[in-house]
């Protein structure tokens, strides 16, 4: 049987794993690194460089080196998150054809799907070099709170990279697979997942080989990048107004400060005080370069980032309430993501749940290992080989789904934390006399008003029979597949006139665009 890989496509770093001879193996690069920066650097007319080599180019090519792109994918250009990113990254973010953010580098504009595809193709190349044979199949993980737009954009990126994406699964769920595999457990588990760009908490019931997600909650714009930004803001506050303006105008200076802030954050898990120094950050009135220096203690750092830590527990409260659990009901605590190595996070999480996290779980690698387990299961089932572990994974949809109705309200058809795959239907009527068509607008979120939720897409059911308002009955069917991706059908109940849509993200690419990008992109020399 061919191999199928599991990919944790992270904001800061990515990991790729495989199950070989019944054992999980995390795949290294040529230098032995098992985590690979999700960084893509574009030179003038050159092939892009990915991974650790790309990180080495960040200072030399700040406007051509793209990082943290996962925070942007699947969002609308005018969203709060994109507006915030435009002011914090050194590369250019520009609006695309579908109101999607794109990256302009030198004389070319790239979709976020292309950026992620370069990272995925790099990881696929590492796997092929490691295994000595072509790799075609993969399971890719996403944050549990990713919406339909973001999930589809990630699947599109996998297809552009030449992968057959067997499944998109949630990161905390993948982590639980790796944690509980082959162990006779019957307990509730909490997976606290704080990565570089996102935070998720999932509550699961593990019963032998059955993994049932009971609830999930998250914040797709809360992660290590925000902790770095908080330290950067502290550093900026120690500069004069003129020097602050210089830093904000200079992509190179902002990048230097970001990397210094990130290093200070890491240092303070091991020492009580660190000294931050950034050479050549600004220029004085005579044009001479000046360094930035400042001391930062662990106590100061904890005070700076406390609001961010508190936000994670507000999300935890939400997930536990939805699961009808308390922290004391949790029998196992799994911590995932590089930020959980931070001392303040470890102490705060242990205090909140009243227990220590599970040992033997590498927070950087566990998601990828879980994805590899699921990849082997799915490929074995698809090919009828009987391979895999025989585990049953029951996941949920993280946010409610519904349609816009008269008055601008959102009528929910599928509630959040519903087990997937799932489907449902609901009957509606026309709202005007002689109405010949109806527009179905699909939204995801918990707000009562449709405009306050995330719009996933729309389609029109035409050819309705002429009748007074309320006489024509329309049945709307919702279906969510195993990837958490939405399909919607509307049908006039009497005539059978129907229209259907596999919701294409309003900010996403068409199937034809994905196909063209897959054929056009040059994946040679990505820096394996």
What is the predicted role of each segment?
Residues 1-87, 92-99, 104-113, 118, ...:
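Oxyanion-binding/catalytic loops of NTP- or PPi-dependent enzymes
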